[in-house]
Regions:
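Compact, glycine-rich, soluble single-domain proteins
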Residues: 22-157
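Positively charged n-region of N-terminal signal peptides that target proteins for export
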Residues: 1-4
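Bacterial N-terminal signal peptides
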Residues: 7-15
Length: 157
C-alpha cells in the first residue's frame, strides 16, 4: 500500500508540474511564455518578450501595453542597418496576421519599458495589460528572468 501511495503521489506531482502553462488566451489570441529581462539597481530600461498566435478569422493588432512599473511602455521593432542597430517605436501597433504567430524576442520585435519606477528585486512576476484592436485586452504575468548571452558574458572592456 505504501508503494502504491508513493507512486500515486509521484504521478500526481509530475502531472501538476506539467499542467502549469505559460499560455494565456483572450478570444482567438494565444500568448505564450511572456517574460522580461531583470534589471540591475538604478537601471531604468528593460525589455519584454513573448509569442502571439492569432487563431481568429481576421488580422489583429497589438495596439499597446500597460504596466504600473514603468512610465513608458512601447512596442518596438529592431533591425540592423549598415552595422548599426535601429529601434523604432511602432506607434500604430504590431500587426498579427490571421492564422499566424509572431515572436517578440531579443534582436527583433520586443516590448520596451522605460522610466522604471518600481524595484524588481525579489519579484518573480510583473503583470502587464496587452491591448488588441479586435480581441480586447488581457492582463498577464510576465516572468522576470536573468538573461545573459555568451557574447555579453565574454565582453571585455
Amino acid at each position: 500500500m505504501k508503494k502504491f501511495f508513493f507512486y500515486f503521489c509521484l504521478f500526481l506531482f509530475c502531472f501538476i508540474q506539467n499542467s502549469w502553462s505559460d499560455d494565456f488566451i483572450i478570444n482567438n489570441i494565444v500568448i505564450n511564455k511572456p517574460w522580461i529581462k531583470s534589471i540591475h539597481s538604478g537601471q531604468k530600461v528593460t525589455s519584454g518578450y513573448l509569442e502571439i498566435i492569432n487563431n481568429s478569422k481576421s488580422d489583429d493588432v497589438l495596439l499597446s501595453i500597460e504596466s504600473n512599473f514603468a512610465k513608458n511602455n512601447q512596442i518596438h521593432s529592431m533591425n540592423i542597418q549598415n552595422d548599426v542597430m535601429k529601434m523604432k517605436h511602432l506607434k500604430s501597433g504590431l500587426l498579427i496576421k490571421v492564422n499566424s504567430k509572431i515572436g517578440l524576442k531579443p534582436g527583433g520585435f520586443h516590448l520596451m519599458f522605460s522610466d522604471i519606477n518600481e524595484e524588481l528585486k525579489n519579484k518573480k512576476f510583473l503583470y502587464k495589460k496587452l491591448n488588441f484592436k479586435k480581441n480586447g485586452s488581457i492582463e498577464i504575468p510576465f516572468q522576470i528572468k536573468k538573461k545573459y548571452t555568451k557574447d555579453h558574458v565574454n565582453h571585455k572592456h
